[in-house]
Amino acid sequence: MSFWPQSRKARRRLTILLAIAPVLALAVGLALYGLRDSISLFYTPAQAQEAKVSAGRKVQLGGLVQHGSVVKYPDGNVEFVIADQKATAKVVYHGDLPDLFREGQGIVAEGSFNPAGVFEAKLVLAKHDERYMPREVSKALKEQGEWRGEGADAPAYGSQKP
C-alpha cells in the first residue's frame, strides 16, 4: 500500500498541497515574527508579579496612580507608583504626561520592566473624560474589588454611541 494516490487527479492535488503547505507555513511564521514587537499584553501590578514578566518584554501596565507617589524631576523624568488592591509597581517615564494624568486616576503605561523591577514606560495613557476608564483597567479593578464606582456607568472606549 503506497502513500501516493493511484489516480492522476489525486496525485496532482496532493502535489499542489505539498508544495503550498510549506510556503504558507513560512508566510505565517514570518508574519508572526514581524509582529512580535508590536504585541503587548496587559497586566495589573499584581498580575505582572504573579506572571514574573521578564525584563525587557514589552507589556502594558495598568492601575490607579497612587496618591502622593508622583515625583517630577527637572530633567523631564517622572516617577510614580501604579497600584491595584494586591500590589504596586514603580514606574519611570521620561516626557510630558497627559493633561488628564493625576493621582488616584486609572492609567495604562506601555513599556517594559528593567532588571531592578522598575517599569520603564515609553507611553502613558490617561482616561480622557471624567467618566471613562480603560476597559482593561476597569475589568482588572472589578475582579480585585478595588473598583471605586467612578465611571462605572460609562461606556468603554469604542462602544460609545454617537
From Swiss-Prot:
GO-annotated biological processes: cytochrome complex assembly
Annotated InterPro entries: CcmE, CcmE-like_sf, NA-bd_OB-fold
Entry membrane topology: Single-pass type II membrane protein
Pfam families: CcmE (PF03100)
Composition bias, Basic and acidic residues: 140-151
Periplasmic side: 35-162
Cellular component, GO annotation: plasma membrane
Location of this chain's protein in the cell: Cell inner membrane
Transmembrane segments annotated in the record for this chain: 14-34
GO molecular function: heme binding; metal ion binding
Residues noted as binding heme in the record, renumbered to the chain: 128, 132
Region (Disordered): 140-162
UniProt keyword list: Cell inner membrane, Cell membrane, Cytochrome c-type biogenesis, Heme, Iron, Membrane, Metal-binding, Signal-anchor, Transmembrane, Transmembrane helix
Cytoplasmic side: 1-13
Record-stated family: Belongs to the CcmE/CycJ family.
Function summary: Heme chaperone required for the biogenesis of c-type cytochromes. Transiently binds heme delivered by CcmC and transfers the heme to apo-cytochromes in a process facilitated by CcmF and CcmH.
HAMAP family from the UniProt entry: CcmE
Protein name listed in UniProt: Cytochrome c-type biogenesis protein CcmE
Protein source organism: Caulobacter vibrioides (strain NA1000 / CB15N)
